[in-house]
């Protein structure tokens, strides 16, 4: 299995204070819509629900991490992921495909 990194963004829009922790388990859920058919929602099942999205812009993704557009065809409708690094705004996470 290959480990792919992606940037989690939008967490600050869902919560006033950061809830992200290294090692936190996440679920990726494909949520295409008419504005962005490559939308991938990031969910925590520990009572928090949606905490953000996979970055889909060169302006929001960090380093060499995958954008939602590159990742969407590599995962099922739901996929497990984990936070690797917590940043000021968001996190770098990994998913095994």
Model-derived segments and spans:
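Conserved active-site motif detector
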Residues: 1-97
């Amino acid at each position: 299995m290959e480990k792919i990194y992606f940037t989690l963004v939008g967490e600050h829009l869902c919560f006033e204070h950061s809830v992200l922790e290294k090692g936190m388990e996440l679920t990726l859920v494909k949520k295409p819509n008419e504005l962005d058919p490559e939308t991938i929602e990031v969910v925590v099942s520990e009572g928090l629900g949606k905490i953000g999205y996979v970055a889909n812009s060169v302006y929001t993704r960090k380093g060499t991490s995958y954008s939602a557009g590159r990742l969407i065809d590599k995962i099922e409708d739901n996929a497990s992921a984990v936070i690797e690094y917590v940043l000021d705004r968001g996190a770098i996470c990994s998913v095994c495909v």
